[in-house]
Amino acid sequence: LKQTNPALFEAITRETVVWYTGQFYALFFLERMVKVDGFTANTLVAMALLIGTPFFIFFGWLSDKVGRKPIIMAGCALAALTYFPLFNALTEAANPALAHAQRTAPVIVSAQGDTCSVQFDPIGRNRYDQEGCDIATAYLARAGVNYATEPAAIGADALVRIGDQTLTAPTARRLPEAERARAIAAFHGELRAALDAHGYPPAADPARINKPLVVAILALLVIYVTMVYGPIAAMLVELFPTRIRYTSMSLPYHIGNGWFGGFLPTTAFAIVAATGNIYNGLWYPVVVAAFTLVFGLLFLPETSKRNIDA
């Protein structure tokens, strides 16, 4: 366990969050937050993967020349420094109408703090349909709408303000069971109409998607993946002596990928719903990447010249 800790908290955790962000969360963001249709989003991501995939070989080869650590650290640093501007640019390129509405028609949710849940639901069993705040913020987050929050008076209903229009979110727990779904659906319809009136599109307009720019941004995200992932197999082999190599590699690889990477989309959405900003989900990979960058610079050894037969 002592020998696997550096690999888990440095190499695998960093590789995992950069990998999941560049390949999986980018697709999730395009479809769920920017509202690009699934076929177009998957096609654009596939094109970016075709461009970026050869860099796995390139950075693996380069790591034989200059070492594993410099390339992995550089990929980690670039990811932490550029994720926010890149995903902002992705919104501008994929759904310019949404980006414009976010700037010109801010949305404010007014609610009591204790009625707003942290919507972390890794297994998809929780239902955030009792309090008005949860009903409003869950819908706005799924719609890719940025919103600010402000406290409301004790006992007051949750309100959503878009420009000069104010909507009251239903507190479903106060309603008879038979009326809850109807009240929530009616509120969703009113909220969708208000968003439409203020320029928030229900979906990205395919004719306005800057496809070359979207592919370029996605390809750059994939290249970050290749920088941290290309050298990682060799580094893991070189980190451990032969007698414990596969046990030592397996533990950090599966825990790092399963826990740190697997929870990324769910955690990112929970952060978005809690903060009201569609980009704040990026704090999860940025913080993890920054932490593991510092950890790696201090504690992770360079392994490229080690004898793997030892």
Feature map (PLM): residue ranges:
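A membrane-interface helix-boundary motif in multi-pass transporters
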Residues: 37, 191, 195-209, 272-287
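Extracytoplasmic gate region of multi-pass secondary transporters
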Residues: 2-51, 87, 114-150, 161, ...
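A late C-terminal transmembrane helix in Major Facilitator Superfamily
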Residues: 243-274
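Low-complexity, proline/glycine-enriched hydrophobic segments characteristic of transmembrane helices
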Residues: 88-216
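Interfacial helix-cap and linker-helix signal at transmembrane-aqueous boundaries
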Residues: 31, 62-63, 267-276
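Helix-to-loop junctions at the C-terminal end of transmembrane segments
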Residues: 56-66
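Cytoplasmic membrane-interface "Motif A"-like loop-to-helix N-cap segments
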Residues: 65-76
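Multi-pass alpha-helical transporter architecture, strongest
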Residues: 82-93, 288-310
